[in-house]
């Protein structure tokens, strides 16, 4: 690395091979070594002023960049002013205050909440939830509630009484006792089953396997002599594998008529 007037230089080959610190080639063309990191553009004065809250350089300070260009050209700022014709350059590099930065313009923030509270049309009017518009007039709900009078106390523990005439002038008992004749169990005749004794060893079960055309029973105690012979023969002749649940009407018909069904293949 060759240092001339505080500026570091190195040849092109050493810079490409990342050996600029070891370069001592004075016989080759040299290049200025750029400092590591991001090159600063603002001057030191603007950096210090940026730390305060009321100063904003806004990226317009190029004093440091211009000073490096002058150093590369080997000219001073006075010579640069004469050459460019701009006699109003910033002299912060000479210790004077930088003129690139500008103070922030503080804008007056409009307080929207205060404006809304002042200009609100419903400021002096009752709340919408507590007022009612009747014929273009706003009436408070409190006045309406007072006109209704006190609420009568209702005993919630008392049972509810049905009307004496019932519903549609029909007595209420008819809604509980009225049943169809087809569903009434009392209308069926179970004379053949009255002699049976319900015991643990004598039970009658109804298989639930589905077949729409055939029916079948399974009688667990075929030696029950108290049953009618017609009922016993009918139950034993039914197919146990192809059966479905029977209605009370079918049982009544079997018991009364003694229908015999053959085995189903």
From Swiss-Prot:
InterPro entries: Copper_Homeo_Regul, Cu_fist_DNA-bd_dom, Cu_fist_DNA-bd_dom_sf. It is found in: Nucleus. One of its GO terms (cellular component) is nucleus. Transmembrane segments: none annotated. GO terms for biological process: intracellular copper ion homeostasis; intracellular iron ion homeostasis; positive regulation of transcription by RNA polymerase II; transcription initiation at RNA polymerase II promoter. Zn(2+) binds at residues 11, 14, 23, 25. Residues 103-129 are annotated as: Disordered. Trans-acting regulatory protein that activates transcription of the MT genes (metallothionein) in response to copper or silver ions. PANTHER family: TRANSCRIPTIONAL ACTIVATOR HAA1-RELATED. This is Metal-activated transcriptional activator protein AMT1. The lineage of its organism: Eukaryota, Fungi, Dikarya, Ascomycota, Saccharomycotina.
